[in-house]
Amino acid sequence: MYRIEVYLKSYLPDAKGLGLVRDICDLGITAVSNVRVVDIYWLDADLTGDELESICRNLLADPVTQEYQYGQDSQGSWVTNESYHVIEVAYNPGVTDPVEATIMKAVRDLNIENVKAVKTAKRYIIEGQLGKHQLEVICDRLLVNPTIQHLVKQESVIFPGNPQYSFKLERIDILKAAEAELLGIRQQFGFTNDELEAIVAYFHKRERNPSDIELETLAQTWSEHCVHKTFKGKIKFGNTTIDNLLKNTVIKATEQLDKAWCLSVFEDNAGVIDFDGRWALCFKVETHNHPSAVEPYGGAATGIGGVVRDILGTGLGAKPILNTDVFCFAPPDFPYDKVPEGILHPRRVFKGVRAGVADYSNRLGIPTSNGAILFDERYVANPLVFCGTLGLLPKELSCRGKQSPGDLIVLVGGRTGRDGMHGVTFASEQLTDESARISSSSVQIGDPIVEKKVMDILVEARDRGLYSRITDCGGGGLSSAVGEMGAETGARVWLDRVPLKYTGLSYTEIWISESQERMVLAVPPGSAEELLNLFVSNDVEASVIGEFTNDRRLQLFYQGNLVADLDMEFLHDGRPQLRAEAVWQQPDYAEPDFACPLELNEDLLRLLSSWNVCSKEWVIRQYDHEVQGTSVLKPLVGKNNDGPGDAAIIKPVLDSRKGVVVSNGINPKYGDIDPYWMAASAVDEALRQIIAVGGNLERVALLDNFGWGNTSRPDTLGALVRAAQACHDMAIAYGTPFVSGKDSLNNEFEFGGRVISIPHTLLISAASVMEDVGRAISMDFKQAGDLVYIVGITNNELGGSEYFEAHGFTGNSVPRVNAHRAKELMDRLSRAIEKGLVRACHDLSQGGLGVAVAEMALAGELGATIHLNSVPLGGPIDREDFILFSESNTRFLAEVTPECSEGFEEMMGGLQLAPIGQVANSETLEIYGLDNRRVVAISLRELKEAWQRPLRW
């Protein structure tokens, strides 16, 4: 065994190390002067000196910036003396090492065949006088996540052997089990009482006990994550009973609208709409919350990987063309001493999630072009990580495929290991301070290089017509993928034919593993050889593991033994419908009792520096949004490309002028007051952003993603009902159907007798077809002398606003939506932009008018003069701060040239709008109050500094 160390040349700055110095300083440890990071590689190999030199020189080290050394000393160490400390960190046994497969292939490409295995680690050389406790704090909070990593000590075994598995069929006695035993089984598998009773009755009729793999299959199929049993349950809400909340709200709106351009909704891995008659678009947003809480990097990376595979598995396979990401964290400056035991600090979660999404998306070659980041202390134990992907596929291939009995079940992509075990049941549960330890096998570490190869080959296989149906192997693993594909036919699987990462997996582990980068295909026997050869020729594994039948049974075999035999009808339709009661009562919060400040400079700067409003450029710059060459309007816009764009626009078909606008809406603080208006506001915000960049409402597809607490509590469930009802009402009013969605429930954390529940959170994502991308506009001011119009009504609606939050209040006047008036306003503004009457447009959201005009000014590097007494009001408001920071919905700022003002006002048809100021050839934003007294005068430099400083990491 060889140990190779690769490190930067001594005269070069270590960017990773400098970042760690800053992070260590944030912990309150100031004695660290420098950190150097060394890459460690262990090779289990029999190599000549020349071969070892070739691997180091040609593969592992960059001769321009790096040096290397090697030897046969396999031992890492924790070395410490007065001036420096050495710490090594490696992956735990069984955790996928993402670099290992790449190195193994590269070594083979060097014609070196004697490398059996590779492991990697990081060595941190920390300079400074530190005590043992300080080192432990640094390791615990920054360097080691015990879920997937460990400190390398002298006694560490680098290449532990994997035990062989000896087959033994495990049966679980449920027919004669006592009440206490049944309770244990129910808790182990996550069944409800009614569900376990149905299972007992099923096996009683068959006069046998279930095998462990049969119960695992039922637990996966009936999990909240997979079947959405709360949304599909029977809910008593007041005097009404709602039979299937999903069908009676979100899906009902889509059915009522009955848009011909909706090609596939709520039946495939993603929603599909017509793009141009030749091509179709598909869109899906998933959550990966619990895994990201336990291991942020891997959880977020596999979240992106999973939703990309959803797109690959839509219709007969789509090409991913854009990724989105929306994160909800606790504030990065959350006090360390208030972080509950068993969870990671929000700053570490934030950085890990960001890195996971960036690394996976960038390596897949998919632009990450739209997203949002929100902060609330209640996300401290349950971050929300929403990952979305937009795909493009031929319209004639947009409907879900259909296999025939006799078609082969082919597994392609990555190998199967223990990573991701029980992921869907883990995602359906409430977290505790033991979750990281108990559920460590639920975390997956993805390999984007494998997924990239799978992605490229599948498009070719699709175009050759080599398979009849496709789906991703994600949550629930083969159990979910094969179980769902075979629901209408039946399936027979030989589990010992599944390629494994290592030996020792039981038949059950093979079946429920959620190892990444895998897809399942239904392949006609006549196409199998060509398909297998195609994958092998591109260095991707493909294996025939079973066949589809015509008996509607799921039969699983291992080494010739029948280990599972379930009726598909019971598996998919035998689950008892959940019954629950929901209540909702309007809360009553204290109203603000502070006086209106005489001048509002400090308040505006404070809002620009708030975590929810401040620039997210540090995150955005680490995403590649230019790859594939389709970008039209980017996440950052303006004179220096550092202003906050409202939505992303891409041109996916290069010989067409048509584009796709992608946006989102989310504001959980409104849900504290009324989840109905929170949901309505999220829909309105997503649509506002489309209009602001030049889109329209003619062909907009919506997606819903609910992040909620424990819905077994009636008040929490009642809030969910309110939000779902608003989704229906807004979709109907705007004429914008929902095409896909996902819910993530039980986002709570229990410790020491306390429960932390996340705020009610609804993400609305939107994709709109734009007829001509040449009509796109951005939000930055363009020319001094232009008029600044406010479009829409400003009301005294600051409940849940950033301004009230900054003063320690919630309030009750939550922003509402007049959707019918809003639709007319948006339609008219859209036509005005299309006619070229608007130079710049920005929607008003968090921070209201004050933040919006400041963002337009700093992005365009042009000052402005604004008059609050010209703002159209829906009722009397006698406070300048309330007018400036109101968050009323359906409002825009529009920059219009004086020559176009008359045409603009005529186009708007007398709807509530008014010129409230002018763009100025100055470096100052000036705002005048109700009595024409100046209440804001801030330089553009101060505005930008306040806005950019918080996340200038």
Predicted regions, residues:
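Glycine/proline-enriched, intrinsically flexible loops and inter-domain linkers
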Residues: 94-96, 115-117, 121, 137, ...
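Interaction-mediating elements
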Residues: 35, 109-123, 127
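Long, contiguous binding/interaction regions
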Residues: 1, 12-25, 104, 885
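Acidic (E/D-rich), amphipathic helical modules within compact regulatory domains
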Residues: 19, 23-79
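Short glycine-/aliphatic-rich beta-strand segments at the starts of folded cytosolic domains
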Residues: 1-10, 37-42, 81-93, 122-124, ...
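Short, solvent-exposed interaction modules
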Residues: 66-115
